[in-house]
Every structure is written in structure tokens, then in C-alpha cells.
Amino acid sequence: VPVRLDVYNFGLEVKTNEGIRFIDGAMVKSFECRDLTERESKLYINTKEYSSMQPHLSGFFEILSEGKQQLLKLTVVRIKEPDYNVALNAGSRDTKIYKVTNYYLANESGLYKLPVSRNKTVKMLKNQGFPETLLTNYTGHETDLKPVFDSFNSSQ
């Protein structure tokens, strides 16, 4: 069944024989999407499952790595209103929409937002018990972060 995640309205659009139906995100606990081009499945879980750790989050976490230390990805939409000043004829007249991605570490002790800075992320992961040998090849990109978590979780 074709499904599209609506990040802005926090829900799922499902294509059925009768047309496209919208399911409110609050009614969905988790879902799995299979990407036909990559032959890979992605698991999404509602942020309310982690509400005891971070009550202010809303949306769906994409689970990038499962295990003792989970790597989660949360994509949200930010809207920047126009800041045009007529008197100065300066600023932007357009509303801008940004897609912001944040990464989180989840374990039995809590849910932690990973810092954007590589050095701060490495320091935080060391404090969570990651060995320094796993963190040597981490450059600060998601493509390097996922193998670090996968290696750590497979060794536990």
C-alpha cells in the first residue's frame, strides 16, 4: 500500500482504491516502509512512545539503529515568516519552509539529542559507553553515525 509521511501535518497519507486517506499521527504507534529502489525497510515509531523521556516532541522517529543504544532520526518542519520592512525596502517577502533533521540517542536511561558539533557528539557518545576506537572514523555525518551504532550494538 503506498504511504506518504506528512511531516508538516503529523500524519500519514495512504493511497487506497477509494482515493487518498489521511490518518492522524496520534492514532499511529509505528509503521514500516519498504523502499522498492533500495530494497530496504525503514521503521518509524511515534515520538509519544518516548513521551516519558521527552514530552515536548511530536512526529515520528525513524529508527536508524536498533539495540541497547538506539539511533533515532526526527525530521520536523520549521516555518520562517516574512521579515520584509516597507520603510527600508529590505528583507524577504516570502514565507520560507525548512526541513530540520535532529538525531537522538535512546537507551534505558533516557532520550538524548545528539549535538550538531562532531566533537560534542563524540564526547557525549564516550560518556554513554562507546569505545574510542569506534569513534575514530566518525566525521559528523549520518552515514558515519549509523555504522558506529551498528558496531556498538552488535558487540553488546
Where are these regions (language model features)?
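Long, compositionally biased interface segments
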Residues: 122-156
